[in-house]
Structures are given as C-alpha cells and as structure tokens.
Amino acid sequence: MPEDRFRSPFAQFFRVATGLFLVALFCLGASQVDEQLTARRRVFPSIGAGLRAIRRDASGKYYLLASPSVGVATFDSKGKQLASIGAADSTNGAASNRSAIVFGEDCDIDSQGNIFVADRGLNQVSVFSPDGKLLRSFPVSGPTSLAVLPEGEVAVTSNRSPHLIVVYGSNGKVVRESGDPEEISPRDDLNRYLSIGRLASDSQNRLYYGFTYFPEPLVRLYDRFGYAGQDFRFTGLDAYPEAIAARKEIEHQEKKIQPPVFKPILTAFGVDPANGDVWMCLHNTLLHFDKDGNRQSEYQIYTPSGARLEATTILIEPDRLLIGSDPLGLFDFERPDRKH
C-alpha cells in the first residue's frame, strides 16, 4: 500500500527529526520579544481588585468597572474620582438596592453618556444615566461582554447563546445574531467554550470579537450588521509552543465527560480609534497588529516595580496605553510605536 513508505525506519527517523527541529524553532521563536515595557506609573489608584474594564467617553471622562463591590467608578480627565455608579448597598445587601450592579463583567458608554453594564450576577444588561439612575434593563443569560452601537442597539456576548454575538434593540429585544463557534473539536460543548470571547468597537461602529480561549490568539472584525471581515491572528513561530500545549489540553478534555474548563489565552485586547490597529494582551505579552492584520511588534509588560503585569483590560489612547490587571490596578505605558 502507498502509505507503507511512512512505516520504514528511515521515514520514521525523518519524521521524528523534523518534529524535533520544528519544536526547536518554536522555542527559539518564543523568546523573540522586541522590547520590555515598564509602566511609567499607576493611575486611578483607588481601583485594583475586581477590575474588569476601562472606557473613555468623548469628553475625556473615564469609566472603570470593578466587581463585585465598586460598580462603575467615574473619573475626570485628570484622574479625580467623580462618582460610583451601581455600587451595592453594603448594609442592606444588593437585593434591596434595585440599581445595584451585582457582578458586572463589562461596560460601555453611548454618545449621550449612558452606561451599559453586562451584569452576570443579575443575568441582565443594565443601562444607567450619566448621573447613575437606572434607566432600564433587559434579561440576558450570563452576559460576559458588550459594545454599544448606534440607534440604541447594543451587541452582547454570552456563552449560553448559540451565536457569538447577539444584538439587542433599545426595547431589549433581539435584533440579529451573528458568528458561529469555531470547529476545533468533535464535541459541540468544547467548541462553544473555546469560542467564548469579548467585544470591542471602533469609531465606524464595527465590532471586534476576541476569542479568549482559542489556541492561536484571534480577534475577528465584524461590520455592524454581523458580516465577518479581517482576522487578526497570532500565528508566528513564537505562537506555536502555547498553541500546541492548548491543543493537547483540548484533546485531553475531549476524553472527559465533565464540562470543559480551559485557561484564558487572549486576556485582553483593544482597538486604536484613530487607525484601527489592534493590540492584544496574552497575560504579560503585548502584541501590536496594524489594521490589515499584520503583526508589527511584540512586547513584555511590567509594573514600575518590575512585577509581571498580567493584563485583563487595555485602553488605547493617542499618547499612551492604559493596561490593567486584577488585582494590581491600572498602569500608564508610553506607546512604544510612537517612540521613534
């Protein structure tokens, strides 16, 4: 049979040698980092443990979501705290406070300054006015991320939805759904878990979906109406060691009957509103892609004291990167692409 040639001793030796050579290349590639980045300073020092998201509105005001106790803390452009929205009543409990955020996973701000919160604790999306009044809410089972769209719409992710993105209208009803789980495993439940992700948007109201657990870090661009476009994918030699380990873990869990559990790979990402560049965080590794999906640079990030910064949120600004971690808080980094 034709396949017998692969069973000869020489062929087996060749396959093993090739495999070892590729592994060596992967290991060499994994150590190739353009620069070590150290934060200039910590910002918004009152926020640390429970940090989930940071947003900025057109006026320069910042919104920091920390769960479960803080809610959404607002700051002016100079970093002075203004208010705390949706914080639970510590004396009477969250159940007695109708406007409380029980466990917010993500937030976003519309053009009127209204604050949208994906509240996994209440299984709903809550909408607050700029002064913190609860305007409305609608049910979503296990929301994990959201992004505000024009005309009162909001895109939401939930690992309990068959599609990756569900868009709700201003009345809280489903308008459209888009995105199917990636097919990595024969098991549908593993595919759905591995396709869990988070959302970001840009100035053109396009959506970016970042796959949290995908073996090869991936962010996919969608237009407002759910049509997929550019992929931002980390697939160089330096991406392979972790990808190989992740795929081996997938194979291992395929044999189990218990519900799948995986460690996050893409821990945060953000979009530059000026040019559409994408920045990915893989724990303390920072990747920069241009708007066409070409990787530009790779960095490792540290706090001013030299500790690894395991990023969980990032905000791209014209003159700096704000990168945050739970529980270390938020840090100000000089933009490495603007140094030269």
What annotation goes with each model-predicted range?
Residues 29-340:
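Eukaryotic scaffold repeat domains enriched in small/polar residues
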Residues 16-27:
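Bacterial N-terminal signal peptides
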Residues 8-10, 18, 44-45, 223:
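Sequence-pattern detector for short linear motifs
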